[in-house]
Amino acid sequence: MKYIAILFLVLVVIGCENDKKSNQKVIGQQAENQTDPQKQLEEEFGEYNEEVKPDDLEYYKAYNTALKLWKTPFHELNVKTSFGKAHIIVSGPKNGEPLVLLHGMNASSTMWYPNIKALSQNHRVYAIDNLLEPGKSQIEGEVKDMMEMMSWYNEIFDQLKLEKFTLIGASKGGWLAIYIALQQKARIKNIVLLSPAQTFMWINPGSEMLANLTYTLAPKRKRLHGVMETMSVDVDKIENSYIEQYSIATQKATFSKFILQMTPYSDNELNSLTMPVLLLIGDNDIINNEKSIEKAKELLPHSETGMIKNAGHFLSIDQSEVVNKRILQFLSLNQESSPH
């Protein structure tokens, strides 16, 4: 079974030049030396690094349109790292307890639109676009292994001065949240897992998974609605502007070798996580089921679990109000009096 799951995962994700001076005749006269346009921008605006490739224009437009769904103030932060630019959407009061959001595969940080207003009311929220997926983070060079990916996140946490914070991860972001917590146990205050993929159990191949696989191999826009019906109990509830952004993202996505490393965590690894952990899954979830809840209860020392009614894998959208309430209740119960 695990080899089938691995096979599924393999398939599912298929400088400025120096100043130049030229002598040109303009209407019979010598033209003045011209400054390189990029150099001018750098001198006028300081660090000018917001480069957008022509192929990304359509996606960026869709991303920005989806951001209009965020019914709360935000600003976009670009953090320079050794591996490229980290794009982070920041919301909430500056003195609020920090929350770091890790989105699902190819979903980008815009997926949090039904949750961000509630989560950022009293918390400082940092939604990070994954470096290896469609989004506004931009990779430079190569990320060789998961430890380098961890280094990328550590650079972000350090620059944001996040000493103690809560991780909230959805789907693939949930798996990643556990990975980060295993490397940074002292830094992670709480973990919230929203139907984490391949974290407690192997994904069971089936007809619904086959539909997702078929779409991934040939991501046609007309097929997307049917695929999303396997992930959501009410696709019509999902905002069209987000679906458009997600559609373009799935067409842009390339295979990541790190998918092969997304295997369920061992009993010892899960048992070593002593911070409070909240696990929520949908009752119509094709990624997780009651076995995930049972394993979380058995192995995580301080866990809280919940099965959300009338929700699929996209439970943060299907039942956003219920999910938001459960998350905030969990955070309130596990609030520390000490400053972060």
How would you label these PLM feature ranges?
Residues 87-135:
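Conserved HGGG/HGGXW glycine-rich cap/lid loop of the alpha/beta-hydrolase fold
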Residues 16-97, 163, 332-340:
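Alpha/beta-hydrolase fold catalytic core
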Residues 127-168:
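Active-site loop/oxyanion-hole signature of alpha/beta-hydrolase fold enzymes
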Residues 311-324:
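Catalytic histidine-centered segment of alpha/beta-hydrolase-like enzymes
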